Amino acid sequence: MFRIGQGFDVHEFAEGRPLIIGGVTIPHEKGLIGHSDADVLLHTIADACLGAIAAGDIGKHFPDTDPAFKDADSAVLLQKVWEFVREQGYELGNLDCTIIAQKPKMAPHIESMRKRISELLETSIDNINVKATTTEKLGFTGREEGIASQAVVLLQKK
């Protein structure tokens, strides 16, 4: 049996925070605002995985009203989600992600992101795709106010 999940997330830029995307710290003058470390890509992947097994979203499992998740490492949150997915009897088929950002350029960091995500999801890097695009200076990402991401995951019964 196969299950498909889709995830989407957005975070706003702010001064004085690190920029962490896909589990990788990226040099930039601003980071993203969030209750956790605001890793927009890992949040998107978690939502896609949870959606594939009809288990809600990241906010249901790690609410931003719970102080236990304040400044949480999104890699740890994704590991917990992945453990839950595996407990339901699923493994990863493949994952395809898109980061939507005007700046900074993501290309130099894509392979590091793929490697980190493959580690977190206990799979071959060949099952992980990460790409980036801009909105040609349109909308909030084009105005460099934040970053968005999308992901689609295919899970299969073990």
Swiss-Prot record:
GO biological process, one term: isopentenyl diphosphate biosynthetic process, methylerythritol 4-phosphate pathway
Recorded metabolic or biological pathway in which this protein acts: Isoprenoid biosynthesis; isopentenyl diphosphate biosynthesis via DXP pathway; isopentenyl diphosphate from 1-deoxy-D-xylulose 5-phosphate: step 4/6
EC number: 4.6.1.12
An example molecular function term from Gene Ontology annotations: metal ion binding
InterPro entries in the cross-refs: MECDP_synthase, MECDP_synthase_CS, MECDP_synthase_sf
CDD domains assigned to the protein according to its UniProt record, in alphabetical order: MECDP_synthase
Cofactor: record remark: Binds 1 divalent metal cation per subunit.
Stored Pfam families: YgbB
Name of the top EC class for this enzyme: lyase
Residues binding 4-CDP-2-C-methyl-D-erythritol 2-phosphate: 9-11, 35-36, 57-59, 62-66, 101-107, 133-136, 140, 143
Site (Transition state stabilizer): H35, T134
Record keywords: Isoprene biosynthesis, Lyase, Metal-binding
Cofactor: a divalent metal cation
Catalysed conversion reaction: 4-CDP-2-C-methyl-D-erythritol 2-phosphate = 2-C-methyl-D-erythritol 2,4-cyclic diphosphate + CMP
Binding site for a divalent metal cation: D9, H11, H43
Function: Involved in the biosynthesis of isopentenyl diphosphate (IPP) and dimethylallyl diphosphate (DMAPP), two major building blocks of isoprenoid compounds. Catalyzes the conversion of 4-diphosphocytidyl-2-C-methyl-D-erythritol 2-phosphate (CDP-ME2P) to 2-C-methyl-D-erythritol 2,4-cyclodiphosphate (ME-CPP) with a corresponding release of cytidine 5-monophosphate (CMP).
Subunit relationships: Homotrimer.
Stated family: Belongs to the IspF family.
Protein name: 2-C-methyl-D-erythritol 2,4-cyclodiphosphate synthase
Organism of derivation: Bacillus cereus (strain ATCC 10987 / NRS 248)
Name of the gene: ispF
